Curated annotation (Swiss-Prot):
It comes from the Viruses. Keywords: RNA-binding. It comes from Rotavirus X (strain RVX/Human/China/NADRV-J19/1997/GXP[X]) (RV ADRV-N). Residues 328-395 form the DRBM domain. InterPro entries: dsRBD_dom. PROSITE patterns: DS_RBD. This is Non-structural protein 1. Pfam families: dsrm. One of its GO terms (molecular function) is RNA binding.
Amino acid sequence: MMSIQRAAQINRQFDYMSIKELWMAKFPLHKPGDCLDMFKNGDYTGPTMGCIQKTKASKKNTIFHIKSDFNSTEYDEPPISGFKMFTQHCCQRIDEHFCGALHPVISNIEFEHNQLKTRPQVASELNLFIPCGIKNLKIESGEKSTWIVGTKFRKCMCLKPVIVAATIIGTPINKNLITFCSSDYIQVIVNRNREGSCGICMGNVSTYEACGNWTNETWGEEFSLDLKLCYKCTPVAFIFSLMMSTGHKPYVSKKQFEENRRKWERVLNYKICKENLDSHLACANHENVYKSIKKYEFFDSVWVYHLANSSWVRDLTRECIESNPGPNYIQLLNEHSQRYGFVQPTYEIIAVVSDGHHSYQCTCYYKDMKTQSTGPSKKNAKHQAAEQMFRHQCF
C-alpha cells in the first residue's frame, strides 16, 4: 500500500523511537500531510484500504499510515456526539513558511504514552490548541498551575507571531501542544456512533456536520462518506471533500488564500494581535481544556518577538555554533580563582516569568559573595551574573 510505503522510514524505526518522536511523526516534515495510525486490530490489506490508495489525496502523497501500539478501542474517546475536529493537514516545519496546517510546539516536557491515543486534529482532552497571536498561557488544574511560555516564534500566514517552541514552568502537563492560524481554520462536528462498521478497524461509522467556519451553514444536518470509515481511520481530505460536495465552502476562498500568500511574501514586519482570541480557544479545544485556561497574553511588541527569537538562537553559543561577542567573564572569573587558589564559582539557573515574559535567573556564588542576574536566555543571565561578580571581586 502506497500510504504505508511513504511512512516506511518511520515504521522501520518504530521500536527504537521515543514517545516524543512518535508524536512528532504524526506531523510530516517535508510538506503538509495526514498521518493515520495503523491499529493492531485494523485490516490494512482489504478493499477499504485499497479504495483509499486510489484517491487523489493518496496520489498526491499526503496520506501516511504509521505503526501504532494501540487497538482502535484503546483510543481516547470524546463524547458520543458533538466533538469537533479540524479538517487541516499537519506540518512539522518550524522555519518561516506560508502554511495553514496544524503545527506541533516543541517543549521541555516529557511525553506520556497515553498522549499518543489521539489524532492531532481532534479536540480531545489530550490536545491543547493555541491560536497565533498568543505568547503565554496559564493553565490551572485544581490547585496546580502551569505557565506555557513561548520561547521561539515564526510568522503565521496571517502575519501574526505563532509559537514554535515553548518552556513549561510549574506543574508538567500531559497535553499535546498544537498551533493553528486563528484567521483561517476549518472544523466539523463528528458524530462517532452511527450504524455501520468501519472497513478498517470495525468500529462504528462516523458522520459529520458543518461548523460555523463554513459558508452555507446547515446546523444539525449530518453527512456521511460513501466509504464506510470511522473518524480515526478517515483522512481529513475525505471529510473536506465531503463538505465541499454538499455545498459548503471555507470562509477563506482559494483566491483570498493566494492573495494572503503574496502579502505574506511581501510584508516583512509582523502584525500585532488586536482581536479577542477567546472564541478561537473555545472553538478549537475540548470543553474541559478550555475551562483550564485561566489566562493568556497577546504578543504586543514586535521588538519582544525579535528578542525572543534572537535569545533562542544565542543559546547555540554553548555548542560553538555562534560566537559570543565581548569579554568572556565566566572564563575570566575561573582564571581569577585559579590564579589566587580560590574555589571556582558555581551557578544556579532557574526559569522565571518576569513581566509576562519568559526569562532565566542566574545566581553566581564565589568566595563569600553572590550576585544575581536575569536575562532572556540561560547564557545571557549567566554572563551577566559572572560580569557583576568579576567587577566586584577583581577591581
